[in-house]
Regions:
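Catalytic core segments in nucleotide and nucleic-acid processing enzymes
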Residues: 1-97
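Acidic two-metal-ion nuclease catalytic site recognized across multiple nuclease folds
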Residues: 102
């Protein structure tokens, strides 16, 4: 598994990023998928609420992932913001998966 590409697609919330950070403790090559600012902003009509946000530092996130995590953790857009992965549009998912093949 350590020689394989690994993609992680979780909810865009503080817990989703915490799980990504934990995964990278075992599989440091894991790449996030559809957990970026563009995905979050494109699906603003489907935002939900995260009742209890993670507050700890996540040292295994990339700079781009950390920017989104900090936005969520610090309530920069709104308090408790989250986007559940199942709320992301199918067309967006299909396009993102197709981009992996290139």
């Amino acid at each position: 598994m350590h020689q394989r590409s690994v993609h992680y697609w979780g909810d865009i919330d503080t817990h989703g990023f915490a799980m990504l950070d934990q995964l990278r403790a075992y599989l440091p090559q894991a790449q996030s998928l559809m957990m970026d600012e563009g995905t979050l902003m494109h699906h603003s009509d489907h935002w939900g609420h995260e009742a209890q946000a993670q507050q700890r530092d996540l040292p295994r996130l990339t700079a781009h992932e950390h920017a989104v995590y900090d936005t969520l953790r610090d309530n920069r857009l709104r308090a408790g913001l989250r986007l559940e992965q199942e709320r992301i549009g199918f067309g967006w998912v299909k396009q993102s998966l197709a981009a992996l093949q290139k």
